């Protein structure tokens, strides 16, 4: 992306590495604390002191996927040992419940909303890091996508999602790009 040599990018990625949970993945601090809703709103809705995470709590596959996307764009950091360790955590969590309440239902993996992590975003992230369908966990995710292609050649957006043609077409494009990057035609 042209920013590999930019010190600000380096500083940001190093900060993300320092913010990992003890298990090597990421989450957000408000999830690691037992907070009441009004406290979460106060902490996230205005000026407040930064909340430090409880690093002993487990990683979230959702937040780990989001953070790993930043590392995939950097030629050096996507090969970093700690980043690879986090990628292994993400890979091992495919189709499993998240550690935190908002995504505990494994069906969220196959609910395709453009801005939230799901099976496709995880496979895009892992593919960009060099993982391929020879890996059994990646193969299982790829197989799910292939097996769940609709008769019209597109994919459904997921349980409870209204079918919008344009969104389904964009989803199909992204899936096809990921499959092509995997060498699957």
Regions found by a protein language model. Name each.
Residues 140-155:
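Short glycine/proline-rich, acidic loop/turn segments that cap or connect secondary-structure elements
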Residues 20, 94, 146-150:
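Short alpha-helix boundary/capping elements
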Residues 1-11, 22-85, 94-140, 157-185:
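An alpha-helical repeat/solenoid feature that recognizes helix-turn-helix modules
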Residues 16-17, 86, 90-91, 145:
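Buried hydrophobic core positions in alpha-solenoid tandem helical repeats
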């Amino acid at each position: 992306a042209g920013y590999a040599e930019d010190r600000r990018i380096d500083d940001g990625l190093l900060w993300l590495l320092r913010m990992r949970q003890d298990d090597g993945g990421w989450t957000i601090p408000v999830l690691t604390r037992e907070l009441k809703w009004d406290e979460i709103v106060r902490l996230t809705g205005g000026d407040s002191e930064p909340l430090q995470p409880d690093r002993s709590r487990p990683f979230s596959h959702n937040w780990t996927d989001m953070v790993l996307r930043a590392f995939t764009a950097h030629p050096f950091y996507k090969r970093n040992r700690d980043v690879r360790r986090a990628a292994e955590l993400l890979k091992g969590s495919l189709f499993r419940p998240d550690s935190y309440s908002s995504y505990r239902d494994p069906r969220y993996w196959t609910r395709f909303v453009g801005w939230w992590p799901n099976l496709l975003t995880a496979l895009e992230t892992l593919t960009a890091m060099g993982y391929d369908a020879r890996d059994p966990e990646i193969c299982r995710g790829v197989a799910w996508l292939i097996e769940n292609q609709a008769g019209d050649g597109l994919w459904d957006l997921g349980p409870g999602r209204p079918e919008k043609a344009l969104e389904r077409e964009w989803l199909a494009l992204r899936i096809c790009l990921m499959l092509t990057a995997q060498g699957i035609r």
